[in-house]
Amino acid sequence: MLGARAMSAVAVLTGDYHLSKRYTQLLLKDFFNLPASVGTISNAEEIVSEALKAPVEEAKEHIKKQPCVNADETGHKQQGKKMWMWLAATVFVAVFIIRGSRASSVAKELLGEFFNGTLTTDRYSGYTWVDIAYRQFCWAHLIRDFIKISERSGEAGRIGDQQ
């Protein structure tokens, strides 16, 4: 049985760094002279996952009740399949979920069906179910869009070049 720190290390190595159980086993042995079987590593993953269930659910519920939330989503491939990493963040809490969809149903899962705070996002249509009076567009996204417009040819570019 591994101690709390070793189990935490296993969780980071296999979860965050995506090391296989075999590589995690080798790393523990080579760096810490800590022998651990693949089964021990699997058990540590299970124990850490179970220990994190309640805090993760608490964080998800916290997000849904906040007066101001920033949200975004970004696509990536996971084992060759298109996936989306969704983020909802407040000053103190950030929640990430990975789903195979960019649909508004995932935004509702993350923020709650009846989110009633102020939501800062890009202009992605998956958030249009939130009343526009409670949506704020992300300044960084707007600046990037303005720069792209200013780099166009024609009238838009001419106006964009003015100071």
Identify the function of each model-found stretch.
Residues 1-163:
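Catalytic center-proximal scaffold of phosphoryl-transfer enzymes
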